[in-house]
A protein has these predicted regions:
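The canonical Cys-X-X-Cys-His
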Residues: 316, 327, 364, 569-584, ...
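Short inter-helical turns and helix N-cap capping residues of alpha-solenoid HEAT/ARM repeat scaffolds
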Residues: 396-397, 428-429, 458-459, 492-493, ...
């Protein structure tokens, strides 16, 4: 069943029926094991019961020290696929369920092993989306911050019990997280086929990677030949002729071995699982000139391989007994239902091998080595004094050290501060010194003198810890530490120099950018040059990120809310989308497939992405499957994201439409809500189904007949093509002013776009820029006005640029010195006063020009562009009536107009 390197053994710790579908394990301070059981996961190919509250967190205890768990309780039952079960104090767990936005604290108050109290711990830790893309696997790191996958922030429990939050870059992790002896957090990406991600620095400092993160072919797995080829990526992911996986597709469950009951050459090695390949990978971490590279410890082989098609390793953890515990869901289907759609390659494989009938099992395995027995000592940390906990910092097993530090920080017992300071200064064990240092930091008892001593230590690893720990003091306004950081960019060890640069950047120390650039330029060490250059270039760390008040790329002025929307959208893109669409929006290459094959379609320069907003909205809400114009992609399906909020959809859509060289209008939550309301669809679109529902601009404007209630002779200016020409009523805005379009033949219209201010073309481009080419506002729609010059009024939230300096904002009188407007009966040609959108509008349609129904749309206009969308309706005549009253001499103008239709 299993193939392991010589000397290694694997044996069950727990199996079904005591547990089912185990996906993760944690241990509390007394060594009791908590198992996350996703008992509802993929009970059939459609995942029809996945969200039923039948999952649990079970607790298991070895009461006599023989290595066998003999006491079992259900700590928390009736859960929806739990993702986090993290122990704090005795009987206290942090719990996060699937599709729950909030993390809770569960407490067993009477000691029976069953939680009987539930309290909110942190609101907003979770999300509602595809279950594979939700946070999980919490780590209390060396720095006393809590990290979990996906979320672009870290949490901390303050001494008063409050939960603090600090932003980080998105970590890229999918399932579980880990840390090494020096507090570097580790993550693995699954769906993006990457494996370990962001490996060059702790994620708190940024998402740093280099081209050679991995040795050649590191992402190629080596399963036992004779697989059943059940890969979501189809034949592109099948190694022929043996039917096994040819590239990572589902890496998960990361761990750094830090125990003491396996061979010493394993210490510090990285372990993660590939459940589609049925393997566990062991990787050597090699640091050269400050840069990390991962290498397969068993070239063209693996640490654990299995011949059993139901072997599904998803998580691996250090255990209190010094060994590694391996979680095996032991199930048929490992992908979520959205990737096993009817008619898909994977669905056919599931049906062929009846994988949908293989579930409700599970195993937890212990990996040992010949001649090295597991440590049978049972932890009893909950009953130990603070002084006894400090002694565990000398333990050779990292689990004991981490747990003791966590409990000391939670206790906030400062009676051990003198002992900790002595240990930090004098212990012969460097790891004990590091834990003592960080425990002092967690107790609020670290002082600058000790931090500086560490920064001057002969051991570069201790110098790095001194820098990192001192950041708490710098943030507390001890800015004298800036001089220490700056001095350390000249350290002889490149790893120390890199840490100094990271700290200077993250803490935004004055003069940091120039010093980092100078250091990177002057150094011949590759790591210093690479990381320093990435810091200065920006985009992968928070330190150099512009503030919301800064002017955007391309000279475009955005509102604060638009800039926030871009930042939220960027964060989500880096969390979820990049792994398939690529960090540059060009589509992530599908390794091993024919040249040019990507996991998902390119977003950069896409006419559909830059086209009408409904395309992006509908794809995000409902998903997209099948080929796109004859081209297939590795993921085969864009899963629906409609479980997210309207704001979430709008943020992501606005980001991709204004990044990677794209330039299109912003999308608002209201626009998403309107599409959501009209689109009731349970399955993803195909392109053939979707395109007929996307509005396209009528191209026969030369045949339109235009008229108006006031100044009708000028109405024809709108389609004349004469630069600067427009229609306006020749008087301030007042109810009853209307502008009418007669089409040459009836059309199924759904939208009217009115541009009131003439476009100003000052160039632009880049992220955040507004395109001026066809399709910027919608497929075939007229161009969106180019960016206003610096100093122009802030743009309205529709995403349209602001009017030029001196133009009136909507609903406001003209700027001082501006013309008051033309005399009644005049105007409408070139050179008139600045015009704005309608204060209010009402749209009616008719098929004969005589019979007019109730308004199909009503609302408030915007300047310079008013977009009016409504339920598709057959119309030959379209009348837009102005309904508001100007407070001054504000004139309604129409410079250009477009009418959009849908096929169905």
């Amino acid at each position: 069943m299993f193939l392991l390197p010589p000397g290694f053994k694997i044996a069950p710790v727990l199996t079904d029926p005591l547990i089912q579908d185990p996906v993760g394990v944690t241990f509390d301070g007394n060594g009791r094991m908590y198992v996350l059981e996703m008992r509802s996961y993929m009970q059939d190919a459609d995942g029809s019961t996945s969200r039923q509250p039948i999952s649990r967190i079970s607790r298991h205890e070895d009461t006599d020290g023989d290595g066998v768990y003999d006491k079992h309780t259900v700590f928390a039952d009736n859960l929806v696929m739990p993702r986090i079960a993290y122990p704090l104090q005795d009987g206290v767990l942090l719990v996060l369920e699937t599709d729950n936005r909030d993390m809770y604290k569960y407490t067993d108050t009477d000691g029976d092993g069953v939680a009987d109290k539930k309290e909110l711990f942190y609101a907003g830790a979770g999300r509602v989306t595809n279950m594979e893309w939700q946070p999980g696997g919490l780590t209390w790191a060396l720095d006393n911050w809590l990290y979990m996958t996906y979320n672009p922030y870290r949490l901390r429990i303050a001494p008063d019990g409050k939960v603090l939050r600090e932003e980080t870059e998105p970590n890229g992790g999918q399932w579980w997280s880990a840390q090494d002896d020096y507090g570097k957090t580790w993550w693995v990406d699954g769906g993006g086929e990457i494996g370990p991600v962001n490996i060059q620095a702790p994620i708190a400092y940024g998402a740093f990677n280099v081209a050679d993160n991995f040795e050649p072919d590191f992402q190629v797995p080596y399963p036992v030949p004779g697989g059943i080829a059940d890969m979501q990526g189809g034949m592109n992911r099948v190694r022929l002729p043996d039917g096994t996986l040819n590239h990572f597709t589902a890496a998960s469950g990361v761990e750094i071995y830090r125990g003491d009951r396996l061979p010493k050459d394993m210490l510090g090695d990285l372990f993660f699982n590939e459940p589609v390949a049925r393997i566990v990978r062991r990787a050597k971490i090699v640091v050269t000139d400050g840069l990390t590279q991962l290498r397969n410890a068993y070239p063209k082989s693996e640490f654990v391989r299995s011949t059993d098609p139901l072997f599904r390793p998803v998580c691996i953890v250090n255990a209190p007994d010094g060994t590694l515990y391996l979680m095996d869901m032991y199930t048929g289907i490992i992908q979520d239902a959205q990737f096993v759609g009817a008619g898909s390659y994977l669905r056919r494989k599931v049906e062929q091998y009846e994988l949908d009938k293989q579930h409700n099992w599970g195993r937890i395995w212990r990996i040992t080595y010949e001649g090295m027995e597991p440590d049978r000592r049972q932890p009893k940390m909950y009953s130990e004094t603070a002084a006894q906990l400090v002694e565990h910092f000398n333990h050779p097993n990292g689990w004991w050290r981490d747990t003791a530090q966590k409990l000391l920080v939670l206790k906030q017992d400062k009676s051990v501060v003198p002992a900790l300071k002595t240990m930090a200064r004098t212990s012969a064990n460097p790891l004990a010194r590091i834990h003592a240092l960080w425990t002092l930091e967690g107790l609020g008892s670290l002082d600058a003198a000790l931090a500086r001593e560490m920064m001057k230590n002969a051991d570069p690893k201790l110098r790095i810890q001194g820098i990192r720990a001192s950041e708490t003091l710098y943030k507390a306004r001890d800015t004298s530490l800036a001089a220490d950081y700056k001095a350390l960019v000249k350290d002889p060890d490149p790893n120390v120099v890199i840490q100094a640069m990271l700290t200077l950047n993250l803490q935004k120390v004055p003069g940091a950018a120039a010093l980092i650039e100078q250091t990177a330029s002057a150094s011949s060490v590759r790591g210093i040059k690479e990381i320093g250059t990435q810091i200065i270039k920006g985009g992968n760390s928070l330190g150099q990120r512009p503030s919301l008040a800064d002017t955007g790329a391309g000279g475009v002025n955005l509102t604060v809310e638009q800039r926030r929307a871009l930042q939220r959208g960027e964060s989500t893109y880096k969390e979820l989308c990049f792994s398939c669409h690529g960090a540059d929006g060009q589509g992530a290459p599908m390794q091993g497939a024919p040249a040019g094959t990507t996991l998902a379609p390119p977003l950069a320069g896409s006419a559909r992405v830059n086209g009408h907003r409904d395309y992006v909205i509908k794809v995000l809400l409902n998903g997209l499957t099948g080929d796109l114009e004859g081209k297939t992609y590795g993921t085969a399906v864009m899963v629906p994201m409609g479980s997210n909020t309207d704001e979430w959809i709008a943020d992501v859509a606005s980001y991709v439409r204004n990044s990677f060289g794209n330039g299109a209008t912003f999308i608002t939550p209201a626009q998403v809500a309107a599409v959501r309301k009209e689109t009731k669809r349970p399955q993803p679109w195909t392109l053939a189904e979707l395109l007929p529902t996307i509005p396209t601009a009528l191209t026969n404007s030369a045949e339109w007949k235009l008229t108006a209630s006031h100044n009708p002779a000028a109405a024809a200016n709108v389609t004349s093509g004469t630069p600067g020409a427009r229609w306006d009523p020749g008087a301030p805005q007042a109810p009853g002013q209307w502008f009418q379009i007669e089409l040459p033949e009836p059309a199924r219209v759904s939208e009217v776009v009115i541009e009131s201010a003439l476009p100003f073309n000052f160039g632009g481009g880049g992220r955040g820029g507004r395109g001026t080419g066809p399709g910027a506002a919608g497929r075939g729609a007229p161009p969106v006005p180019a960016p206003a010059s610096p100093g122009a009024t802030a743009a309205p939230q529709t995403g349209a640029p602001a009017p030029a300096a001196g133009a009136a904002a909507p609903g406001a009188p003209p700027a001082a010195g501006a013309p008051a407007g033309p005399p009644a009966g005049r105007g409408g040609g070139r050179g008139g006063p600045p015009a704005s959108g309608p204060i209010g509008y009402s749209v009616q349609v008719s098929t004969d020009g005589t019979t007019w129904g109730a308004p199909v749309a009503q609302g408030a206009g915007q300047t310079p562009t008013t977009t009016i969308a409504f339920t598709p309706v057959m119309a030959k005549f379209i009348r837009i009536t102005q309904t508001g009253t100007a407070s001054g001499s504000e004139v309604w103008g129409v410079a250009r107009v477009s009418v959009l239709q849908v096929a169905k």
